[in-house]
Amino acid sequence: MKITPVKALTDNYIWMIQHGNHAVCVDPSEPSPVLEFLVRNRLMLAQTWVTHPHPDHEGGAAALWRGYMESPVYGESDIEAATHTVTAGTRFTFGNGQVTVWATPGHTDRHTSYLLETSDGIHVFCGDTLFSAGCGRVFTGTVEQLYDNFQRFNQLPEGTLFYPAHEYTAANLRFAAHIEPDNADIQTALKAAEHTPTLPVTLAHERRVNPFLRTEIPAVRQRAEALVGKTLNSGLEVFAALRELKNAYR
């Protein structure tokens, strides 16, 4: 199975998953890049997966379905183009892989991540939940939900690959360096982020550079406390403080 990022809009990635002469597209913000990819690689669209109902994730799903009406569109019930409604625990297949749906709200009150298990490991298509060195902004969900999902992600094998939907890595790493100026792994990742795409990333990598997965590290907690000017008594409080600090960071 081959997984390729296709650039769209300003900083979006539409992930294309190939098996034989069939493909899945994940979060098609617009149809044209997907159609061009399919034609160039002589592929048929087999499935579309949508993580949440923002235009830069579902904007091209309806047009793709009209062009490939035999190919299902997977998404929660608030995805207008969905032909196959998913909920937490929904399972289906693509090629030789098993897909499991996780409910991962926080960025939005309804958000889905798709875990694709293949012979070479677990691939997580996480939309706007986890970014490399960062996390999604909280819009209609809650920071508590986002924190809980990071704890759940952190229980996956360290070789798990994450496929976020945006190229935010360099900006996120600059914030991470602001939180942990002495973290050599962050400095190394910053240099590497000059070259894109920076994705996918392993869970092992994110544990070293993502402050939102490092809320139990004393240096992270102490830095967050110094910046917000109060004691933070739990991982959740550190996570919430980091999210507010990131919102204001320039």
Curated annotation (Swiss-Prot):
Its EC number is 3.1.2.6. Pathway: Secondary metabolite metabolism; methylglyoxal degradation; (R)-lactate from methylglyoxal: step 2/2. It catalyses: an S-(2-hydroxyacyl)glutathione + H2O = a 2-hydroxy carboxylate + glutathione + H(+). SMART domains: Lactamase_B. It is an enzyme of class 3 (hydrolase). CDD domains: hydroxyacylglutathione_hydrolase_MBL-fold. GO terms for molecular function: hydroxyacylglutathione hydrolase activity; metal ion binding. SUPFAM superfamilies: Metallo-hydrolase/oxidoreductase (SSF56281). The keyword Zinc applies. Its cofactor is Zn(2+). Binds 2 Zn(2+) ions per subunit. Keywords: Hydrolase, Metal-binding, Zinc. Zn(2+) 1 binds at residues 52, 54, 107, 128. Zn(2+) 2 binds at residues 56-57, 128, 166. Coiled coil: none annotated. One of its GO terms (biological process) is methylglyoxal catabolic process to D-lactate via S-lactoyl-glutathione. Belongs to the metallo-beta-lactamase superfamily. Glyoxalase II family. Monomer. NCBIfam families: GSH_gloB (TIGR03413). Thiolesterase that catalyzes the hydrolysis of S-D-lactoyl-glutathione to form glutathione and D-lactic acid. This is Hydroxyacylglutathione hydrolase. It comes from Neisseria gonorrhoeae (strain ATCC 700825 / FA 1090).
